[in-house]
Amino acid sequence: AGGSSDTDSFMKELKELAKGDDRILFTGFVQGAMLDELYSNAYIYTLPSDLEGMPLSLLEAMSYGNACLVSDIPECTEVVEDKAIIFRKSNIKDLTEKLQDACDDIRKVGKLKEQAADFICAKYNWDEVVDKTLALYGEKSR
């Protein structure tokens, strides 16, 4: 789900490759109930980014209890720690292998799903983030 930063010709090629496979959806930008539905029913959330800020969609996906497959950029690995499948950025072969492994290993994906929501909600609990920020400001003002 979401827009594309890729070229129109690449998206056209992807859609052509996926034609006839009703498991693959190109939704474009979605929000609200439709986004909730997609997160709630995903088998695995994949974030193949080469560059990110704080990946809010990754936090959302994990909060819905999704197993995640992310590139090894620091912005992703610092979020997921050891609670996701990680592949080498820009390495299509590694991404393909890890995605295939996830499709083949239902138990592993199930374990990641079980851990995801509790882990991410504890790590990014708003009250704790505020407390840590205030403590940091307190240290710096001394």
Q: Which positions does each model-derived feature cover?
A:
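Glycosyltransferase donor-sugar binding loop
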Residues: 1-12, 25-29
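Aromatic "clamp/platform" in nucleotide-sugar-dependent glycosyltransferases that forms part
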Residues: 50
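Conserved acidic donor-binding segment of nucleotide-sugar-dependent glycosyltransferases
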Residues: 85-93, 101-107
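A short, well-ordered alpha-helix in the C-terminal region of glycosyltransferases
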Residues: 108-122, 132
